Amino acid sequence: MRIGIFSDVHANIEALNAVVDAFKSERIDKYVCIGDVVGYGASPNECCDVIRKVAAFTILGNHDAAVAGRMDYSYYYDAARQALDLHARQLTPQNMEWLKGLPYEVREGDLTFCHGSPINLEEFEYIFSVEQASRCLEIWDELGVVTFIGHSHLCKSFALTRDEVFEVVATKFVIRPEHKYIISVGSVGQPRDYDNRASYTIYDTDERTFEFKRVAYDIDGAAQKIFAADLERNFGNRLFLGV
């Protein structure tokens, strides 16, 4: 089975549509969204509608949790809170109820899907370094063979043995025996790795291969919608830079 995995759409329908179109040529059997459908961008309902239609399941992200009233988001900076408040007002009742019901984690066989670190799921902790990934050695026995995460907006992979963690730098690789993996799948709608293309990924359960993919999209169209909305202009400007 080929699973199309993506995360951190952040209300960017232009990027999401480009990713969905790109997936169509990849013989995908199932789609999974790892959260943060909303926040930052100008098209929260449109993104919810598409993801509800295509994804087999969606994981709760921190921005989703904030909009749905499932977490205290007072620690967010002012512009991010403003976007969350705006999206909470804009979402249809159906989309709001959907966000309220999203799970923190889904496990399927030897695969785990969660938005942030698999430790303390409700805390949405980041993993973008070997040091942060090393904390997962504490829960080695509970880890799936592959744990897919989002949250950092970075494309990062870490391979774990029982006593060691190292970063995997390849964009396509085979899951090796006697190892476990934590894979951060990047961001569809707000990449932060200085590559402004939307990120999406593919995991083949038969071949046991994982691959990062990128696709260009109408950044100007997405940014112009942000500029026209009651949103921080920098949320649009940063799309051009991928930061």
Kindly label every feature range from the protein language model.
Residues 1-4, 106-113, 176-181:
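Beta-strand-turn-beta hairpins that frame and shape the catalytic cleft
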Residues 1-54, 227:
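N-terminal active-site segment of His-dependent metallophosphoesterases
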Residues 10-15, 39-41, 65-68, 119-121, ...:
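Active-site environment of divalent metal-dependent phosphoester hydrolases
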Residues 18-21, 46-49, 72-75, 127-128, ...:
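Short, glycine/charged-enriched secondary-structure capping and boundary segments
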Residues 53-120, 124-143:
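Active-site neighborhood of divalent metal-dependent phosphoester bond hydrolases
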Residues 160-243:
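Acidic, His/Gly-rich catalytic cores of divalent-metal-dependent hydrolytic chemistry
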